[in-house]
């Protein structure tokens, strides 16, 4: 197996220009494809997941022209894809398969969607149930509740609120929100969220971007959303993709652990991404944090031993960046508890189980619950036997690069899995650490 040896590291300092946000990139591509008019998308993330969306849109007949320097000109279809049948490979891109499933279910065509084996283990049943409430015909061609999917032409009828669970993945709600304006009947449709909505900041991203394309959604708290139907998305002409706030978290944490200063450019206080609030969590742990509209800078904790403060933190608002906190907890002065992270279990891997397993390899004491993880730093660090396994999960690989600030070298297995969102991550990380 390919591996990369990192550390032990002592210092981190420098400036990083972040790649585009995955969550924003794939939402913007789909909205631009569905809109009326042309959109030039700038600073699009170049990664496996965005290529999955670009390939799918091409197979659906959408004109997408590369302009160089991660810019693309998307010619909108006015809500109807030219191709009424397609076989689409979705890789392991949840941000592609879920919104596309909803959009295609309302197109009146015949489509199949499938992916890598892990994608076929990631739940989609709650979204399918929601779409069936408006008459969509969707069949499971493998296990019930999971991809692969076969979507068939069917008349869509909305005569009651749509109910969807919010406690498994916010992407189900995002998919419905983005697709329902395509329904041709004039009026509004209400989505009622059943249970506690997780990952609320990702819904805020969705609503913000829909508004940029001319569709306003009204919400009653986080339990009810009213979506206009029979309206067209309107191309904004040009849109810039923010830097990826989840990816920023690794460099900001490096600044806290390696003294800093480390500055990230591309996200800041004006960001629409929830994971930008990772900087607040670092501040609570004692790191020195400064920020502007489009940048954040972190220096180490101002205490003699350089350790961070242990914290107890509800991470509903930073589900992806919370993984970075779990590794940073190795360097705290006590036990850190991260709660409200049940969504970790249905991501690229079961991240709760994977995180607990790999932290223990380094000597940490870890308690893993249904929706929480409790990390006590190692009393004696141990080199991870066999290396840190990454489970084909980009965020596992990036988060555990930070463990190299400990007293033992860290071997990262399958480091190329970072290509899902940040192909050049280890080059960038190596450029600011020593």
From Swiss-Prot:
It catalyses: 3-phosphoshikimate + phosphoenolpyruvate = 5-O-(1-carboxyvinyl)-3-phosphoshikimate + phosphate. Pathway: Metabolic intermediate biosynthesis; chorismate biosynthesis; chorismate from D-erythrose 4-phosphate and phosphoenolpyruvate: step 6/7. It comes from the Bacteria. The keyword Acyltransferase does not apply. Keywords: Amino-acid biosynthesis, Aromatic amino acid biosynthesis, Cytoplasm, Transferase. One of its GO terms (cellular component) is cytoplasm. Disulfide bonds: none annotated. It is found in: Cytoplasm. 3-phosphoshikimate binds at residues 22-23, 27, 169-171, 199, 320, 347. The active site is at 320 (proton acceptor). It holds the Pfam family EPSP_synthase. GO terms for molecular function: 3-phosphoshikimate 1-carboxyvinyltransferase activity. GO terms for biological process: amino acid biosynthetic process; aromatic amino acid family biosynthetic process; chorismate biosynthetic process. InterPro entries: Enolpyruvate_Tfrase_dom, Enolpyruvate_Tfrase_sf, EPSP_synthase, EPSP_synthase_CS, RNA3'P_cycl/enolpyr_Trfase_a/b. It is an enzyme of class 2 (transferase). CDD domains: EPSP_synthase. Phosphoenolpyruvate binds at residues 22, 94, 122, 171, 351, 395, 420. Its EC number is 2.5.1.19. NCBIfam families: aroA. Monomer. Belongs to the EPSP synthase family. Catalyzes the transfer of the enolpyruvyl moiety of phosphoenolpyruvate (PEP) to the 5-hydroxyl of shikimate-3-phosphate (S3P) to produce enolpyruvyl shikimate-3-phosphate and inorganic phosphate. This is 3-phosphoshikimate 1-carboxyvinyltransferase. It comes from Ralstonia pickettii (strain 12J). The gene is aroA.
